Amino acid sequence: MAKISAAQVKELRDKTGVGMMDAKKALVAVEGDMEKAIDFLREKGMAKAAKKSDRVAAEGLANVAVNGNKAVIVEVNAETDFVAQNDQFKALVKHIADVIAENTPADVEAALQLKTDKGTLNDELIEATQVIGEKISLRRFEVVEKADADNFGAYLHDGGRIAVLSVVEGADEATAKDVAMHVAAINPKYVNRDEVPEAEVAHEKEVLTEEAKNEGKPEKIIEKMVAGRLNKFFAEVALDDQDFVKDPDLTVAKYVASKNGKVKSFVRYEVGEGIEKKEENFAEEVMSQIK
């Protein structure tokens, strides 16, 4: 039998909201496999679908810059929130976004070599690191292109802790910005249900079927139940199926259609997503300073 650690139990509880003993039993039942443990709990009707929320640890800001039919969304990291709220840092992030939007490099490495008034973007990051006293780094960016009939929508939440760049066909810029704001708030994974990978849909259907069986539902109504619950799943992950935050009586797709448009794409950056911050032991930190 696989040995289950307290950290595994905590992670499963954080992801599913179940109690400690239920989390441990699930992990024991599946030999410590986290994803299988989540499915196990869901099939027993004990947990909702776990949201894959990466711990946000790094500091910094994201921003959006538009240059004609091209736009860019960028994330620049610092070490502390104090620096991230510094006006000099905010100006640097905007400058980096503008330079990348104008030149549309292929990747971060190419972006760092872009020429600026002070040499290259990399030179500017080095200078900022020296002046501000913290490591400043360009983490990622994505260049997005649109057709003449499309509009970009840009939205920054909390000054750039979350940034969204959307592309809407047919509707105006205000509608595109509304879509970007919704994406910032709700965090969908896909534009519409057609974008959801078949394997993900099949897996969800399998889990929902087992859940219905474990509830003792008759076979003849299980299929109808699963179809209904699958629609709820699509509403969680697909933008078009979600209730629009500014008018819950409409889905996002219907809201945009009322403005004679449709959503083509979106990119959402949340600062630090996917980065694990090193956790310092406070006692050890104090001892290291007095040695």
Curated annotation (Swiss-Prot):
UniProt xrefs under Pfam families: EF_TS (PF00889)
InterPro entries: EF-Ts_dimer_sf (IPR036402), Transl_elong_EFTs/EF1B (IPR001816), Transl_elong_EFTs/EF1B_dimer (IPR014039), Transl_elong_Ts_CS (IPR018101), UBA-like_sf (IPR009060)
Disulfide bonds: none
Classification via PROSITE patterns: EF_TS_1 (PS01126), EF_TS_2 (PS01127)
Keywords, in A-Z order: Cytoplasm, Elongation factor, Protein biosynthesis
Cellular location(s): Cytoplasm
Keyword Protein biosynthesis recorded: yes
CC per GO annotation: cytoplasm
Keyword Cytoplasm: yes
GO-annotated molecular function: translation elongation factor activity
Region annotated Involved in Mg(2+) ion dislocation from EF-Tu, chain positions: 80-83
Function according to Swiss-Prot or TrEMBL: Associates with the EF-Tu.GDP complex and induces the exchange of GDP to GTP. It remains bound to the aminoacyl-tRNA.EF-Tu.GTP complex up to the GTP hydrolysis stage on the ribosome.
HAMAP family: EF_Ts
PANTHER family given in the database record: ELONGATION FACTOR TS (PTHR11741), ELONGATION FACTOR TS, MITOCHONDRIAL (PTHR11741:SF0)
Family designation: Belongs to the EF-Ts family.
Name of protein: Elongation factor Ts
Organism name: Ligilactobacillus salivarius (strain UCC118)
